Structures are given as structure tokens and as C-alpha cells.
A protein has these predicted regions:
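Alpha-helical transmembrane segments of multi-pass membrane proteins
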Residues: 1-207, 217-478
Length: 478
């Protein structure tokens, strides 16, 4: 099958999938305020819906392609009607949310209600098409279509703040999303027709009686038949889950930390999510696969640098140091984790299970960082926890035999990982020792801390300060 049509269908589906995320966030902000928690809880909801979409794709992929097309088209028609109904009713229900005592749960409910069905169906997009290709004679390079999917996601994410939100009303945006679903449904139907025709035609070597030409899930074939290490898929299944969970936990933790210490403005959230997607695009390629080890080294260097910076308290230092270092750690960590994830990919026959476990890890990591962490931590401890997790995973990566680690001295990497762990733990102890009282809710974290302050006469006195992130709201000399 020619790759142009599947690639266009995957690109458009991913474009719509990530275009609706900031659009839904924009819809909810007037009701819940501009706090970063609105966005991070939305991310957790999106990651959970992504899991539902991958599970749906995994289950229906066992059916014939024609049956899959009919079922998916029927559900897409329902999603179009659902989205159109919401576009009409949105002004009427706009003021009915945001007044409960559980805003996080209410945001989750709104995401499920407003965009749950179309999001689940769009989430299944790339997995379904790749599964169709894997069953045809044109199964080479199916995993690289995942990079096309992430490119579409990145374009959809950037298009919203630059081209859509400033010029199009919110109601028109939702109608445009419904129209996009219709176009996507047509493309998906045609892709399914070609996949079914190719499989049932006489061009497939698997249907010509040449059994040896048909790769089995455990066979080492082309670069996309198994991971580069040639390890059976079952032995790597836990890694698919853990690496995805770690990367999503990192994304949400960095977003919360930078939004709390700088300012919770939506463009920063989109930039961070865009960087996360770029790491997927770069990692799911031959370059990302070969360079995973070096990205692990850069990740450790970034963690060490950020651990030093976490001791700084001045707001100007926060903006000029925390922001670039936080972005760098997110990029380096994403390239490392996703490159490792690509290296341990299974044969195409097992790709729906692979993506299902990736989505499950993402959902668990997202919910842990944005929903569970605020409930159990009085401060933003999820950020140093994410840094510790990166350091430990980097040490584990270099403890495993892998061609990508050749040329790197493992002992030096383990030493660097140990330094990173000691610095992060030391920073956590230092911050905990300063805090007298900390309170955290959906809208942020406030701390009463011991500090020093210089008087107008130049004297340095001990004091207590009330802070929200790096912003000091008041000082009392002791």
C-alpha cells in the first residue's frame, strides 16, 4: 500500500487529537481559573482517555479490517453528533461548573463529558492504521508512522495558539473540530479499504503459501520487526509501561514546578507539551535509537545542573536559570526515555499491546503527578521525585548490555547518577528544613519559611517569609 494515504490519515487524526486539548483547556479556564492545575489535570484526563483509545484499538484489531472500519465509522458518526451538540449547548452550560469543593474531579468529569468519545476514537487512530499495515504485505517501517503521528500532534498543538485561538470564536472552533472529524472519517475509511484490498489480494507473500516469508512476533527481521536488541517482547513489557509512566510523570512535574515558580500562563504549558512531543518524534527514528545512551548522559548532566539551581531563591534567577534548565531536562529526559522505548519495541504483530502498555504507563504517570501528588504532598515534591527517577533509570540503562552504550564509560555514568541522586536528596532535605508550614490546594502551594533579609540599613536579620513558589508575599523579622 502506498504510505501517503495512511500517513495523511494519521497526521490529521493526531492534529485533531492535540488541537482539541488546548481548545478544551480554553473552554474550562473561565470556570476554573488560570491555575496550572487545570492544565495538568486535563493532561491526566487526556492520558487516561488515550489509554481507553489504545485499549479499544487493541481489542477491535482482532476483528477483520472491514468489521473494524464499520464499527469505527459508526462511532465516529456518533462523535460528530456529540461534538455538534456540545457546540450548540456550550453557552448554556458554561456557568454550571467550577463551584464544587473538588475542582480536580470536576475538571476530569468535564473532559470526559465534553470530549471523551471523540478523543478516545482519535487516540486509536495511529494504532489501528499501523495494525492494518502490519497485517498487509506492506508492514515495513510501521513504527515510523508513530513519528508522523507525533508530528501531527505537534502541529495541532502549535496551530491552536498561533492560528486558531486569536481569530476564531470558541463556538466556531468546536464546529470546525466536528468538520475535521468528518474529513478524518473519510480518510480512515479509504485507508481501511486499501489495507483490506492489499491483504486479500494476491500481492501478499503471506497469502502465497510462502510461510517462511511471514515474520512471526519473535523473529528478528528488519529494524521494525523487533527491537534492536532482539529481546522477546514479553521480557520488555514492563519497560514499555515504566518508561512511558516516567516520561509522563516528568512532563506533568516540570509543568507544575515551572508554573508555580514563574507564572501559570497557557503558552508555557503548550511549549512544554510541544517539547515532549518533539522528543517522541526524534526518538522514534534511527537517530533516536542510536543516540539513546548519549541522551541519557545529557539527562544526568541536566539533572545535576538543575539540582544546583534549586538552591537559588531570587526571582530573576528563577526566570533565567530554572526555565531553560527545566526545558532542557524535559527534552533530554524525553529523548532518553523514548529512545529507550523505541529500542525495545516488539514485532509489528504485537504493536497494539506495545502501545496499550505505553498508554497505561502514561495514564498512571499523569494521574500520579497531577492528581495523587497534590493530595499526599504539601509541597511540589513530585518534581525532585521525577529527577530522582530519571537518574535511577539512566543508571539502569547503562547497567544493561546495549550497543547504544558503546563508547560511554559506564563507571563514569554511574558516578554521575550517584552525584545527581545525592544533590537532589540534599536539596529536598534543605527545603524541608526551611519550611515551618506548607499548605497546598488545587490552586497552588503556600509556604512559611525561615530565611534571612537585609534591612534598609544593611543589616542581615533572620526572618520568616510567606511564599508562593519563588514569590515572597511578606516578611516578618524575628
Amino acid at each position: 500500500m502506498k504510505r501517503r494515504l495512511p500517513a495523511v490519515a494519521i497526521f490529521l487524526g493526531a492534529f485533531l487529537l492535540f488541537g482539541v486539548q488546548p481548545m478544551l483547556g480554553r473552554t474550562l479556564l473561565p470556570s476554573f481559573g488560570g491555575t496550572a492545575a487545570v492544565w495538568t489535570v486535563c493532561l491526566a484526563a487526556f492520558q487516561t482517555l488515550l489509554l481507553a483509545g489504545y485499549f479499544y484499538a487493541h481489542m477491535i484489531s482482532r476483528k477483520p479490517v472491514r468489521a473494524q472500519r464499520i464499527l469505527h465509522a459508526a462511532l465516529l458518526a456518533l462523535a460528530v453528533v456529540w461534538t455538534g451538540a456540545f457546540a450548540v449547548l456550550r453557552p448554556l452550560i458554561r456557568g454550571r461548573f467550577g463551584e464544587s469543593g473538588q475542582p480536580a474531579l470536576e475538571v476530569l468529569f468535564c473532559v470526559l463529558l465534553f470530549a471523551g468519545l471523540p478523543y478516545v476514537l482519535l487516540s486509536a487512530n495511529s494504532t489501528l492504521i499501523q495494525a492494518w499495515l502490519a497485517k498487509s504485505s506492506d508492514s515495513r517501517g510501521v513504527y515510523r508512522l508513530y513519528a508522523v503521528s507525533n508530528l501531527g500532534s505537534f502541529c495541532g498543538l502549535l496551530a491552536y495558539p498561533l492560528l486558531v485561538e486569536p481569530y476564531v470564536t470558541l463556538t466556531a472552533q468546536w464546529w470546525g473540530f466536528a468538520a475535521g472529524l468528518v474529513v478524518y472519517a473519510v480518510l480512515l475509511w479509504r485507508t481501511g479499504e486499501e489495507a483490506a484490498g492489499r491483504r486479500l489480494g494476491g500481492t501478499s507473500v503471506c497469502s502465497s503459501g510462502q510461510a517462511d516469508a511471514c515474520p512471526s512476533p519473535g523473529t528478528v527481521g528488519s529494524a521494525d520487526q523487533v527491537g534492536s536488541a532482539g529481546v522477546p517482547a514479553d521480557k520488555n513489557a514492563w519497560l514499555w509501561f515504566v518508561l512511558s509512566a516516567a516520561s509522563c510523570f516528568l512532563l506533568n512535574a516540570v509543568t507544575t514546578y515551572l508554573s508555580n515558580d514563574i507564572t501559570p500562563f497557557p503558552l508555557l504549558w503548550i511549549i512544554l507539551l510541544g517539547i515532549y512531543l518533539c522528543s517522541y518524534i526524534g526518538a522514534f527514528s534511527a537517530f533516536g535509537e542510536r543516540s539513546a545512551g548519549w541522551w541519557g548522559v545529557l539527562t544526568l548532566v541536566g539533572v545535576v545542573a538543575l539540582a544546583f539551581a534549586m538552591r537559588l531563591e531570587k526571582a530573576v534567577q528563577t526566570l533565567s536559570i530554572y526555565l531553560p534548565l527545566g526545558v532542557a531536562v524535559l527534552l533530554f529526559g524525553g529523548m532518553f526515555l523514548h529512545g529507550w522505548l523505541y529500542r525495545v519495541r516488539p514485532a509489528p504483530a504485537a504493536l497494539t499491546r506495545y502501545y496499550l502498555l505505553i498508554a497505561a504507563g502514561g495514564a498512571v504517570g499523569g494521574v500520579a503527578a497531577s492528581v495523587v501528588a497534590p493530595l499526599i504532598f504539601s509541597q511540589i515534591w513530585e518534581f525532585p521525585v521525577a529527577l530522582l527517577l530519571l537518574a535511577l533509570l539512566a543508571a539502569l540503562y547503562f547497567a544493561r548490555p546495549d550497543p547504544a552504550t558503546q563508547g560511554v564509560k559506564r563507571e563514569a555514568v554511574w558516578l554521575l547518577a550517584g552525584v545527581a541522586v545525592l544533590l537532589v536528596v540534599g536539596d529536598m532535605r534543605h527545603q524541608a528544613g526551611q519550611v515551618i508550614l506548607a499548605m497546598r490546594n488545587f490552586y497552588g502551594t503556600s509556604r512559611l519559611v525561615n530565611t534571612t533579609a537585609r534591612t534598609a540599613f544593611g543589616d542581615v536579620l533572620t526572618a520568616r517569609a510567606l511564599r508562593h513558589g519563588s514569590v515572597t508575599h511578606g516578611i516578618q523579622y524575628r
